[in-house]
């Protein structure tokens, strides 16, 4: 697609290497492993046995059975499993194959509780701003009409979250044993989309590991 290769004298030759955008497709499709890319060394690109791929029906079942859970067992998730999930997530599509989404895993209960309370406090603060007619108009300039309308649809959201918090509930992370935070460079094109795609890959992989998930934010 990028015009890097041309067929000359019956052979594929890299004639415009400067056009390479690092997608790895050339390494992927070569039937005889003749292309060894600096960014995709062959030893790190094992051949995939297509016979082991799930059928369309199996994949559809996985997608249908995945559910967003808000009740979790009080059982730690082994860190090697978390690492495997993060590793799988990067195979989600990304702009220019940047694979620029990084993950922070938090499994410390005190830290998760602190993050949950901070989120409740921030939502309460934002809810108060949305109830002020002048500030609501100013926020519309930054957030846009639709997002402002959505954010202001429940002006009591912050107080409702605080009420649940004071009753000993976790209205943000639902007492999950692990919180995974995906992040990428904010000014990069399609950064948010890339993070969402990676998150969904991770959630499907977690489902096959017997782990429930819920995407927050």
Language-model-derived ranges and their functions:
Residues 1-217:
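Acidic, surface-exposed loops and disordered segments
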């Amino acid at each position: 697609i990028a015009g890097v290769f041309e067929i000359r004298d019956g052979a594929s030759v890299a004639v415009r290497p400067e056009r390479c955008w690092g997608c790895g497709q050339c390494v992927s499709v070569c039937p005889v492993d003749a292309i060894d890319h600096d960014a995709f060394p062959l030893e790190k690109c094992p051949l995939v046995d297509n016979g082991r791929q799930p059928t369309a029906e199996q994949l559809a079942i996985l997608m249908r059975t995945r559910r967003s859970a808000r009740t979790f067992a009080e059982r730690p998730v082994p860190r090697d499993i978390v690492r495997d999930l993060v590793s799988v997530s990067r195979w989600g599509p990304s702009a220019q194959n940047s694979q620029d989404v990084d993950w922070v895993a938090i499994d410390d209960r005190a830290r998760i509780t602190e993050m949950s309370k901070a989120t409740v406090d921030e939502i309460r603060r934002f809810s108060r701003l949305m109830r002020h007619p002048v500030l609501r108009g100013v926020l519309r300039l930054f957030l846009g009409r639709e997002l402002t309308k959505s954010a202001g649809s429940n002006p009591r959201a912050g107080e409702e979250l605080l009420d649940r918090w004071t009753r000993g509930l976790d209205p943000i992370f639902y007492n999950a044993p692990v919180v995974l935070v995906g992040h990428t460079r904010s000014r990069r094109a399609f950064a948010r989309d890339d993070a969402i795609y990676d998150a969904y890959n991770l959630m499907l992989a977690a489902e096959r590991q017997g782990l429930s998930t819920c995407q927050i934010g």
